[in-house]
Amino acid sequence: MSIRLEKPWQPMTQENINDLSGQLGVYELGDESEQVIYIGLADARSKFGLRGEMQQHLSSARYFRCEVNMAYSTRYQELLMVFQADKGRLPELNSDPGYLGRLSPLGNDSGQHDTELDKTPED
């Protein structure tokens, strides 16, 4: 199982936003090349859940993908850490939350990537 958000991109249109549920979860916003520019979450403070969050971003992104997830805070941090491990930085529209751990992708024989928390030399 991949820890990356691998759902298909959807065009950021009012029609697609209206089809979303009001549930909680995480999402990624993409530019015209479907490159991640922001990772966000719909948490307990979000009005109308994922639908409300996408409505706020209607004019700032071309594409989105989302995942309903009740462990949204942990999943959000996980997606940020994976992006940072892959690209060496956070998405351009995310600010540094200041509390992220680090992941190190490890290749295996299947060609998929696993992750492992970085260990200090004392470990």
Stretches found by the model and what they are:
Residues 1-37, 41-123:
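Boundary/linker segments flanking structured domains
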